[in-house]
Design a protein with these regions (language model features):
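Thiamine diphosphate
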Residues: 1-134
Length: 134
């Protein structure tokens, strides 16, 4: 939520989503893909991910306190600009705040990831990237 506020303060539009289960979203997308493969003449079905993110442009940053590979499971069905930040390890810090900073899943890291992503897509210039560089 802090990263959202910081990005909005910099003038960027931000939507915040809470994903309760990356695994279930992946299962849905796989099931829809299998149905479309088995029934090529039928109307193409779309996954829940497509309904949520099919027309999204810009940076889409998935942030999890779990391993990044968990959220990476939905990458094939996400728009360009999808990037995952996760905590691939444990027991390295005395507090959650220190852990999140160590694994770069804190607000500062989210803002940096979003701006770097927008820059790589050519959606912001180097000046805007540097203006918010931390």
């Amino acid at each position: 939520i802090k990263a959202k506020a910081e990005l909005q303060e910099l003038g960027y539009g931000v939507s915040l989503w809470s994903m309760t289960s990356y695994v279930e979203l992946q299962r849905d997308a796989l099931a829809v893909a299998a149905t479309n493969r088995r029934k090529p003449r039928a109307k193409t079905q779309n996954s829940k991910l497509f309904h949520m993110f099919g027309d999204v442009t810009g940076a889409v940053i998935a942030v999890t306190d779990y391993m990044a590979s968990l959220a990476q499971g939905i990458a094939a069905w996400m728009p360009a600009g999808f990037e995952v930040l996760g905590t691939d390890g444990f027991g390295l810090s005395e507090s959650r705040a220190a852990l999140r900073a160590h694994f770069e899943v804190d607000a500062d890291a989210i803002v940096r990831a979003a701006l770097a992503n927008l820059y790589r897509q050519g959606l912001i210039d180097e000046e805007k990237l540097n203006a918010a560089n931390r």
